[in-house]
Amino acid sequence: MASGGLRGLAVAGGGESSDSEDDGWEIGYLDRVSQKLKVPLPVEEKNETFKKALTTGDISLVQELLDSGISVDSSFRYGWTPLMYAASIANVELVRVLLDRGANASFDKDKQTILITACSARGSEEQILKCVELLLSRNADPNVACRRLMTPIMYAARDGHPQVVAVLVAHGAEVNTQDENGYTALTWAARQGHKNVVLKLLELGANKMLQTKDGKIPSEIAKRNKHLEIFNFLSLTLNPLEGNLKQLTKEETICKLLTTDSDKEKDHIFSSYTAFGDLEIFLHGLGLEHMTDLLKEKDITLRHLLTMRKDEFTKNGITNKDQQKILSALKELEVEEIKFGELPEVAKLEISGDEFLNFLLKLNKQCGHLITAVQNIITELPVNSHKIVLEWASPRNFTSVCEELVSNVEDLSEEVHKLKDLIQKLQNERENDPTHIPLMEEVSTWNSRILKRTAIAVCGFGFLLFICKLTVQRKYPNICF
């Protein structure tokens, strides 16, 4: 009854696996003689025909079979229902027909819900969104989790569907729910590198500080997976995006986030979310969206903006208020500078030797930190230009700065050699200075030598007197001492 192959078989969404490779579905094109079922089919054959009609998306045959008495919630082998299969391939019309015939939108198989299956389906985001909307309209719960505690919004975020994320939240989905590994929808979006989803979730009140079971926050997850643009954006402390839509009603949220596609389905909606570049993301995160057109008109890149001086800000028409926001954000991102003010004032002549030694040790430690920092940069820097995520200025600028850095390092090396020679000179002069007052250790050593020599001399003199006394007594026994 079937011939030929048809695409690949849909599997359970979000990494959930069924008990069989094909879950009881035979994939193929349905070779039909007639559009009508002229002869009643046996139950077993009718079920096979129903499965093949679902597989090929034959809406009219599905309706005929339903009219013939087959159950809309038929449980095929391994437990999948017709609606679950239709949702897994994002077949909007098939989902609509089955729901209109009374299919259970809240059905689950081993905690794999139909809504989860739809959110992780194969197909365009527009198709997936329409299927999700249909299921939500039939009271499918957006907060029911699978065996791994992942909810529909996590699957939508993981697969990069900001429109689906928005409509789920509009229907009551919890944004900050965590799965068995502590991942939230934001963590999944950051892990997979879905910038648009990250922005949308922040608007919807996602908490970017929630940690996974291994203690990582979304920005760290993004960095670990080489999504540096998302890492930089999530690292910003100032983020007026966060929670912008959190207090709106469901109707207000849908109205703000989604637009109607009147050309295709007037009763279905989908988002018109636009992707941002790195400059737009930076400005958007600071609430400076109004500056976007101004900076683009003047061909100012993000790198240029981050290195502007006060006069350049003013020259390019950036107000003091906006300047302060940019500078505050930069301050948050800067690595703390070396605080040499905490070191002793080495120029003073009364400085102690211990303080000077401590200064040199701290200076050496700071140099070690600088070497490590450069080594880390070399390790993290992409080896191929096509792997660079953020917009870069001309490589000549970086080369020029590196040349200045090399020059400064050479100057530092020269100054340290001068310092070393000066210290060596002072040491030599001190050793040859007759007025030099030795340290307590040296004085005590000299005193001990004198005491030792005196003791030996006294003992020797006493022994000599004893010998002389014995000799005299033998020769002159009448002499008394």
UniProtKB/Swiss-Prot annotation:
Record's GO cellular component terms: pi-body
Domain SAM: residue ranges: 272-334
Subcellular location: Cytoplasm
Major location (coarse): cytoplasm
GO annotation, biological process: cell differentiation; male meiotic nuclear division; regulatory ncRNA-mediated gene silencing; spermatogenesis; transposable element silencing
Domain of life: Eukaryota
rRNA-binding as UniProt keyword: no
Listed SMART domains: ANK
Ranges for the ANK repeats: 45-74, 78-107, 110-144, 148-177, 181-210, 214-243
Segments for region (Disordered): 1-23
Keyword line: ANK repeat, Cytoplasm, Developmental protein, Differentiation, Meiosis, Phosphoprotein, Repeat, RNA-mediated gene silencing, Spermatogenesis
KW Phosphoprotein (keyword) present: yes
InterPro entries: Ankyrin_rpt, Ankyrin_rpt-contain_sf, Asz1_SAM, SAM, SAM/pointed_sf
Gly residues bias: start-end ranges: 1-16
Sequence positions bearing Phosphoserine: 17-18, 20
Entry function: Plays a central role during spermatogenesis by repressing transposable elements and preventing their mobilization, which is essential for the germline integrity. Acts via the piRNA metabolic process, which mediates the repression of transposable elements during meiosis by forming complexes composed of piRNAs and Piwi proteins and governs the methylation and subsequent repression of transposons. Its association with pi-bodies suggests a participation in the primary piRNAs metabolic process.
Subunit structure: Interacts with DDX4, PIWIL1, RANBP9 and TDRD1.
Name of this protein: Ankyrin repeat, SAM and basic leucine zipper domain-containing protein 1
